[in-house]
A protein has these predicted regions:
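Sequence/structural segment immediately N-terminal to covalent heme-attachment motifs in c-type
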Residues: 60-84
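Short, charged low-complexity linear segments at domain edges
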Residues: 45-62
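Extracytoplasmic electron-transfer domains, predominantly the class I c-type cytochrome c fold
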Residues: 1-48, 89-143
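Intrinsically disordered, low-complexity segments enriched in polar/charged residues with Gly/Pro
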Residues: 56-57, 81, 113
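Short helix-capping and inter-helix turn/linker motifs at the boundaries of alpha-helical repeat units
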Residues: 19, 58-59, 85-86
Length: 144
């Protein structure tokens, strides 16, 4: 969904699709689209699928990033399911370059209530307060 992914990432993904979750062997097939076709798809996704309610600016100063990193590794143990630099679990998507892939507003709202986006998601709803969700978002956005 376009509310989730950044435009440049969408374009690159359509050029060279890959599996987002290490545990899954399924992936989007390569459709061998040219740049013009990819731009048309990107334009369509941005016009139709972006939810304005998910647009949000998150401060990504070093203090927030550090707090988010502590929350990720120490308080919530996110590395149990997610990999960063090939370290961590295999259940959730690898987060190495998540800051280049996802939009900050989407990350924030996903962290606050994952089941609102996908009722079958196994991502835990940790009942994050806004400050924690902002810090985790800042940390994740720093991963590029």
């Amino acid at each position: 969904e376009a509310s989730q992914a950044q435009r440049d990432w969408i374009k690159n993904y359509f050029k060279i699709p890959y599996s987002l979750r290490p545990i899954l062997t399924e992936r989007m097939p390569n459709l061998f689209l040219n740049d013009e076709e990819i731009n048309v798809i990107g334009d369509y996704m941005e016009k139709v699928f972006i939810a304005d309610s998910l647009e949000l600016q998150i401060k990504t100063d070093q203090t927030k990033i550090t707090k988010g990193k502590i929350l990720f590794y120490e308080k919530y143990g996110c590395q149990g399911c997610h990999q960063i630099n090939l370290k961590g679990g295999y259940v959730g998507p690898a987060l190495d370059k998540v800051g280049s892939r996802l939009r900050p507003g989407w990350i924030f709202h996903w962290l606050k209530n994952p089941q609102a986006f996908n009722p079958e998601s196994i991502e835990p709803d940790n009942q994050l307060v806004d400050d924690e969700a902002e810090a985790l978002t800042a940390f994740l956005m720093s991963l590029k």
